[in-house]
Amino acid sequence: MAFLTALILVSIVTAAHGQTVVSIPLGHNYTLIGPPITSEVIWTKLGSVDYFDIICNKTKPIIVTCNIQNLTLINVSKVYSGYYYGYDRYSSQYRNYLVRVTQSKTTKMPNMAEIRSDDNSLETFTSSTTPDEKNIPDSMIAIIAAVAVVMALPVICMLLYACRYKKFHPKKQDLLLRLNI
């Protein structure tokens, strides 16, 4: 049980550590920089059909160009969202990216009369600086998830132990194990 707890904790910390979050507007190209190389970087997209899908040799559903180190995503669409992992075959160097595809927002240019009236209203308006509550860092979410898992596992272990103890030792009565399960 301790091994399972350690495995879950290590996987959560590993997923949160070293990951670069990239937001790319629809229709743009973007280059993911690979790790320092000794031979050639292999790029995979996690969560695709083959789970670890080597993407430099494929043409569908995403179109990319690969050189020895970097991966360029071409004409980005929603299909490109996901985790990209680039690693050097002969060393332990790797880079981890979380790609998020965003809608590009277009706005109309205001005329000069609107700008002047906005300048006057800005002089009278004072705002307090508050942090953006909708933007929670991924590392904080990973830490909270790890704490919740670590707190839940001992409770689950105690319940399982109590059930198994009662099943195999029905004649022994312990005050702590008087569960009606």
Curated annotation (Swiss-Prot):
Glycans are attached at residues 29, 57, 70, 75. InterPro entries: Adeno_E3_CR1, Adeno_E3_CR2. Keywords: Early protein, Glycoprotein. E3 proteins seem to be dispensable for virus growth in tissue culture cells. They are potentially important for virus growth under special conditions; E3 region may help adenoviruses to evade the immune surveillance of the host. Belongs to the adenoviridae E3_20 family. This is Early E3 20.3 kDa glycoprotein. It comes from Human adenovirus B serotype 11 (strain BC34). The lineage of its organism: Viruses, Varidnaviria, Bamfordvirae, Preplasmiviricota, Tectiliviricetes.
